[in-house]
Regions:
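The substrate-binding groove and active-site-proximal loops of carbohydrate-active enzymes
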Residues: 45-52, 131-136, 194-215, 230-241, ...
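Gly/Pro-rich turn-and-neighbor structural signature
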Residues: 75, 166-174, 237-238, 244-255, ...
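C-terminal non-catalytic alpha-helical accessory regions
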Residues: 164-170, 484-638, 644
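An acidic-aromatic substrate-binding cleft motif
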Residues: 158-210, 216-236, 404-407
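Contiguous, structured surface segment used for ligand recognition
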Residues: 20-182
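Bacterial Sec-dependent N-terminal signal peptides
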Residues: 1-22
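Structured mid-domain segments that build the active-site/substrate or prosthetic-cofactor binding neighborhood
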Residues: 226, 231-234, 240, 383-389, ...
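Catalytic domains of carbohydrate-active enzymes, especially glycoside hydrolases
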Residues: 211-239, 248, 252-261, 307, ...
């Protein structure tokens, strides 16, 4: 009995630990601080000497409070209000005064990394009777504290990127006490925008009018990263060049507080497109024959990133994410790294170890490491999963002593064999948790980077990844599903959380069986009834998602469609189409005239696939996400999507079916049981209403 009680207690404690302790409430009680009273918010005070990133976050807090209560608070730079919100960073003049007056314990923040504390303080300074004070150990700590306040007031980190509504509140109160999320477990935590054509690139073109991501786009990305308590970004690089396309990109990220890196095959803060666009001028990407030009290319990258916190990728791969030639040897690559560090020292006028660097052990580079190639002790060693979410190499006890630390490059999007995975989220929640927990347990805690493709529709795995990078110890096998439940409560409301979580968990599980790109008529066994079983499971899930969608308040429907309904409907329809194709082929071989009915079903499902995508691109959220769901996924014949458009699967028809021999009805007569089919038809009609 005692063991059972202990298990229950630990489960409850771990569930409560998924977020910072709740300090915001919406009903008055005792001596709670009135942040918003009867629709009137307190002003925000930021010292004029504060960091630009904190200023930007405070400006966003103004907008967040406006969304919550309908009135925008003032942003003050002088202490002229009886009650206010104060945000500041450890070491700034105003915060020093608070600490000197004994209002804040210096030990809480001294020497800490990206930590914030939030508490209500009486008489923090002359002219202010009471204030909610947010103090960060550094600028990002302050920024995280500001966004934590926003989140607890009801502003989702995904408010813009997934159109999550903000519920109105006339009163917002802060509970007494001191609150903090502590320090992050992983030092650098971020995302990689990758494989971004055609969806993200065309969405950006439509939304911002540019053929590249400019500073307006990256400001939105950086804000999301910071709201998720991340701090790191590998920008998109297929056809874009972050540093060169818009000089304001680097400045924007740096000011906001996001650290920029370049991907595993883009050394020395240079984007691949910068070389590719001038390949005729530069010559071969070959260090043995073109070292002088390449070294100058490297030098310009380091010169350009001066004054930022950016992390430098070192080493060298082939031209354009390709392997180096077979003649490449360890000695040559070690010489590349030696020269790169020499350039870093010459440009920065400091020892190379004072500039953060990472060496990506990706694909063939891991082979060089296994053959004995080594880099200096201060360099972060970046390992990789198998491109499909399964960690395949972790440091042993001796390797874990590497002073520079270890990182992990993890994928929820991939371009490569056996097929691309770019269309939908196919990552089971349990698999990501298990693999990242294993990663952390083996001491990989310096840098975590997630390949997120176009960013949408990977909203939930991005959230899970970032939360695990902040504090993986909060997760265990008993409480894991509380995380997606909390995510769903935040996006759709507490009353919808249980059902939305169940559907999110199931669709992630079902999609993890086989990606949409690899699915075809031969994936499951037709004769044993396996094909019908899995198709029915998905159609049942679609019916359940549609029921919830129809029950939602109108303001939640766009967010629900993006995060739950569309991925369920799109994959359910794909299963329906390929099952129908399998039945068509089977019955055609038997000269069964029902083959023609199944051919019709294939055509109907293929047309519906386009209709679902068109709705996502053009109708949902008023067309805000136009082009974000144009990824090809039907018609693969090799690993790549180098076919012109989605292609109707091959079907056969029996000519003159009335002359075919009479064949008894088969058990395969419907894609789903008739009652389920009728329910689905009814729900789909209500969805359109």
């Amino acid at each position: 009995m005692k063991k059972l009680f202990l298990f229950f207690y630990l489960s409850v404690v771990s569930i409560a630990a998924f977020a910072a302790e709740q300090f915001v409430i919406f009903t008055p009680a005792g001596n709670h601080f009135p942040l918003v009273a009867n629709g009137v918010p307190c002003p925000i005070y930021i010292d004029s000497s504060e960091d630009k990133g904190v200023m930007i976050a405070a400006g966003n807090l103004q907008q967040d409070i406006l969304q919550v209560c309908g009135k925008k608070p003032e942003l003050l730079t002088s202490t002229s209000s009886k009650r206010c919100i104060i945000a500041g960073t450890y070491g700034t003049p105003f915060i020093k005064k608070l600490m000197s007056a004994g209002k804040i314990d210096k030990k809480e923040l001294d020497g800490k990394n990206e930590k914030y504390i939030l508490q209500v303080i009486a008489n923090p300074c002359e002219g202010i009777d009471e204030a909610v004070v947010i103090i960060g150990s550094d600028r990002r700590g302050t920024i995280y504290g500001i966004y934590e306040l926003s989140e607890q007031m009801g502003v989702s980190p995904w408010y813009w990127w997934a159109d999550v509504p903000v519920m109105k509140q006339a009163n917002v109160y802060i509970k007494p006490g001191q609150y903090s999320d502590g320090e992050p477990a992983v030092t650098y935590r971020g995302i990689f925008l990758n494989d971004e054509a055609p969806c993200l690139t065309r969405w950006v073109k439509h939304t911002y009018g540019t053929n590249y991501g400019d500073h307006r786009f990256y400001a939105r990305v950086c804000e999301l990263i910071l709201r998720l308590k991340g701090n790191f970004l590998w920008p998109a690089m297929w056809s874009w060049a972050f540093y060169a396309d818009d000089p304001q990109n680097s400045k924007t990220a740096s000011e906001m507080g996001v650290i920029i890196g370049t991907s595993h095959h883009e050394p020395m803060a240079r984007n691949h497109q910068e070389w590719s666009r001038k390949r005729k001028e530069y010559g071969a990407w070959d260090y043995t024959t073109n070292q002088k030009v390449i070294d100058q290319f490297f030098r310009e990258g380091i010169e350009r990133m001066q004054g930022t916190e950016d992390i430098v990728t070192i080493g060298m791969r082939g031209d354009g994410d390709a392997a180096m030639s077979k003649s490449t040897n360890v000695k040559l690559l070690e010489n590349v790294v030696k020269n790169q560090r020499k350039i870093i020292e010459e440009v920065t006028k400091r020892p190379a170890k004072e500039t953060p660097q990472v060496w990506a052990l990706y694909k063939e580079v891991l082979d060089y490491y296994d053959k004995g190639m080594r880099v200096p002790d201060d360099v972060i060693m970046l390992l990789c999963d198998d491109n499909w979410g399964n960690v395949c190499r972790l440091p042993n006890a001796k390797e874990r002593k590497h002073p520079g630390g270890w990182g992990m490059y993890y994928h929820v999007d991939y371009v490569g064999a056996p097929r691309n995975s770019k269309w939908l989220n196919v990552t089971p929640i349990q698999n990501m948790w298990e693999q990242l927990q294993l990663t952390y347990d083996y001491g990989v805690e310096k840098l975590w980077i997630l390949n997120v493709g176009d960013l949408k529709p990977m909203e939930y795995p991005i959230t899970l990844f970032m939360d695990m990078a902040w504090n993986p110890k909060q997760f265990n096998v008993s409480n894991l599903l509380e995380h997606p439940r909390r995510f769903c409560a935040q996006q759709f409301g507490e009353d919808q959380a249980d059902e939305a979580m169940r559907i999110l968990n199931l669709y992630s599980k079902y999609n993890g069986r086989v990606t949409g790109e690899m699915l075809d008529r031969n994936t499951y066994n037709l004769e044993t009834g396996e094909w019908k079983q899995v198709s029915d499971e998905y159609l049942k899930l679609e019916a359940e998602a549609l029921r919830q969608y129809i029950s939602l308040k109108p303001e939640y429907k766009d967010a629900y469609k993006q995060l739950i309904l569309f991925p369920v409907q799109a994959m359910a329809n794909l299963y329906e189409m390929y099952y129908a194709q399998a039945m068509n082929h089977k019955l055609y071989k038997e000269n069964n005239p029902q083959a023609n009915e199944w051919a019709d079903k294939v055509e109907q499902a293929f047309a519906r696939d386009k209709a679902l995508s068109d709705d996502y691109n053009n109708i949902m959220s008023g067309g805000k996400w136009k082009n974000m769901m144009i990824q090809k996924h039907i018609g693969y014949t090799s690993w790549n999507d180098n076919f012109p458009a989605d292609t109707l699967p091959k079907i056969y028809r029996i000519e003159n079916p009335e002359k075919a021999p009479e064949i008894r009805n088969t058990v395969w007569r419907a894609v789903a049981p008739e009652p389920l089919k009728r329910v689905l038809d009814r729900l789909r009609s209500l969805q359109k209403a």
